[in-house]
Amino acid sequence: MFPQSLIDRILAELLAQDVAATDTDPALVPVGVSNRHVHLSRPDMDALFGPGASLTRMKAMKQPGQYAAAETVTLRGPKGDIGKVRVLGPLRKETQIEISVADGFTLGIKPPMRMSGKLDGSAGLTVIGPAGSVTKEAGVIVALRHIHMRPEDAVRLGVKTGDSVDVVVSGPRGGVMHNVTIRSDEVSATEMHIDVEEANAFGLQNDALVRVRKV
């Protein structure tokens, strides 16, 4: 087992290399692969983990202020359950559950492909925690791939929030991802978000660099 200090130093060096590469060529952006996860509202947090419960910060994420929590829940649909689904913090105004297409088959639901926050008419399921459960009539989506981008990077690339770009992937499973939406604001770190299915299809892992191409 390697000491945590060594692991942290190696990760910091790798991240610094990614930042240096993207500063040299703004068209290169790092990838963040999202597995199934849940964002909870305050009322649902109370119902699942007990009144006044708070999330336990486990690991910081690249997007400022966001983190993976130690807490997990079980998702229950008409056809099955998926356990140990990570909760991400901080709490949100509305509960949002992001899963893959394959997860939808396991659960027996058909979540729409949506951008984060677009929950009207989305799928529902039951979320089970250690202190109780909540049944959501909506809130389940398959997240559309997108790129969070610092404003200065967006300016250098000549793109803005809402623009659709192509992303070119190199390697044995390389190809082009179309219909990738830009999301740029002052609190964003530049990073492309895809789900596990997309990552597997293109042979990508966290922190891999891909190239943005305007269309």
Curated annotation (Swiss-Prot):
Assigned GO CC terms: bacterial microcompartment
Localization = Bacterial microcompartment
One record GO biological process:
propanediol catabolic process
Q: Which domain of life is it from?
A: Bacteria
What's the top EC group for this one?
Answer: transferase
Q: Where does CoA bind?
A: 33-35, 61, 79, 86, 105, 200
Which of UniProt's keywords are assigned here? Answer: Acyltransferase, Bacterial microcompartment, Metal-binding, Transferase, Zinc
Q: Which protein family is named in the record?
A: Belongs to the PduL family.
Q: What is the protein name given in its UniProt record?
A: Phosphate propanoyltransferase
What is the species of this protein?
Rhodobacter capsulatus (strain ATCC BAA-309 / NBRC 16581 / SB1003)
